[in-house]
Amino acid sequence: MDSGKSSNEDMKRAIRWEVFIPAYLVVAVAAIVGIVNKDMLTKASNMFFFWSLDSFGWLYQISIMASFVLVAFVTCFSKIGSMRIGGKDAKPKYGFWTWFAMALTGGIATGIVTWGVNEPVIYFGNVWGELNTLGIEPGTTNAAIFAMARTYYNWTFIPYAIYAMCGLLVAYIYYHKRGSLTVTATLKPLFGDKITTPVASAVIDTLSMLALTIGLATGLTMCITLTVTGLKSAYGIAESLPLFIGIGVAIIFAFTFSTYVGLDKGLKIIGSLNAWFYY
């Protein structure tokens, strides 16, 4: 009883309410607005997205290419690349294919299934008008080359360079510097202790949680939509809101359960099954 109580108290202390509550409120408000007035949420989201793209698009590109260069060259062709996460005597907890399955299904699984076919067709047909800025005629050989190149840029080395960079930073700080599993901890070597003040760390980690939550929500929505349309195409099951909600609840339950039982019994098995079905 005492150990259980102590464990519960530790769990309660582990929840950073100054991070959880603001992020939860933002997501909850967005969800309520989406239910009450979907068009308003869509318009506001698009305005923010295009504003950020116009204002910080250059920074996105620099950050992306910096991640690719650092991961591909610095970590692979320098002494840093030979460093073993966890110490020189550390052993891998899982085999290569298990890690591969978890990385694939946790990284681009839903996105690549959805956009792996759609995106080349979109660029080939100039649906988004990108070919107009390059002087390429839609439906031509050059358009096909551009479409495939753009799709590979979006879904292969570039995104995984970003994931690898973030993962390596967090892992290095946690295992070698004994820091916390937070984005704030990865910034401490650059900005010093001032970045770890309660206010600064709360703001940074709240924004990080929002980015993760919104990203997961996007992937979840794509997954549900893909499943619903697949059921309609294969079995003639009509699309409906109850079906959409039911699939969403099932996916959330599976994810929550896999998180609760731990990496060994949860994500490892689900990721391996996903990868097996995928291939």
Where in the sequence are the language-model features?
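Membrane-interface helix-loop-helix junctions at boundaries between adjacent transmembrane segments
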Residues: V121-F157, G236-L243, F257-Y279
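Helix-loop-helix module between adjacent transmembrane segments
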Residues: D10-A14, E18-I21, L25-I35, F68-F73, ...
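N-terminal alpha-helical transmembrane segments of multi-pass membrane transport
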Residues: M1-T140
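Membrane-water interface regions at transmembrane-helix termini and the short interhelical loops
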Residues: K5-R13, K38-L53, F73-K91, F146-N154, ...
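Generic hydrophobic alpha-helical membrane-segment signal
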Residues: W97-W99, L104, A144-A147, W155, ...
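Membrane-interface loop-to-helix entry segments
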Residues: P22, L53-F56, S63-A66, I204-L212, ...
